[in-house]
Amino acid sequence: MTDKSFPASAITRVPLALLLSGLAGCADAIGFLEFSQLFMSFMSGNTTRFGAAVAQGEWDGATRVASVIAVFCLGAFAGTLVAAWAGRWRLPVLLWLQASLLCLGLGMPEGPVPFPFHVYPVVLALGMQNATLQDADGRSLALTYVTGAVVRFGTGLANLLLHKPADSFWIQAPLWGALSSGAVVGGVLHHYFGEAAFLFTAALAAGLALAVTVLTLAKPGSRLIAGTAPAPDAPADAAPVTVVRERATAPS
């Protein structure tokens, strides 16, 4: 079976996945504490809140949560298009966009209760984050939520007994740990800095963006920062949108 991982090399893909998952957990905890228990990346929780608000006739609250879910979906939509368009610059472009959006929220007006404008840039950034990396099957790695990681870990354990798990099984538990650790860090940062704690997540995204920009310039087409894969979650017969430089030696 064709390996559709992005980046192709686990040397960079796994650390990036863990750091980005930690970033998402951190941002989610900051937003949850700062914005009246509104999730920045955990759309399952927001969906439950939406249902409860509708059931109780709290239309401002229902609109508030629904708008956040829509913006997160827009982020995933835009991130996938950027991933397809940017080619070998996919990682730098997506990470710089995320860093910029995480900063932008701090300068946005609060907006009315149903439409929290200052939340949208953060949610948009985290939606885009899910288009950044792909597993061996071409699926976007679940970087901003744990339900998928927990389910894939559980089914992977079963498949470990039945036959063998998918290649992406081994990263699921570390992803959960990274997201949980990031949430702890986010809670501590919010305690001391309030909403300004988002600057920490922006700085982490910018640091990762700078690192992959340097790698892209120094090693164009390297498996460290590229891959031969369709856009995230594309059908099996979709054409590749990124190109890896072929090497006669061991993959870099």
Where do the PLM segments sit?
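Short, Lys/Arg-rich, polar N-terminal cytosolic tail immediately upstream
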Residues: 1-13, 223
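Hydrophobic core of transmembrane alpha-helices in multi-pass small-molecule transporters
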Residues: 18-28, 37-39, 101, 113-144
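Substrate-agnostic recognition of the 12-TM MFS/MFS-like secondary transporter fold
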Residues: 51-52, 57, 125-183
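Hydrophobic/small/kink-forming positions within alpha-helical transmembrane segments
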Residues: 69, 73-77, 176-184
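Helix-to-loop junctions at the C-terminal end of transmembrane segments
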Residues: 75-88, 190-191
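A membrane-interface helix-boundary motif in multi-pass transporters
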Residues: 89-94, 187-203
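Symmetry-related core transmembrane helices of the 12-TM Major Facilitator Superfamily/SLC fold
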Residues: 96-101, 196-212
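C-terminal ends and interior cores of transmembrane alpha-helices
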Residues: 99-114, 213-216
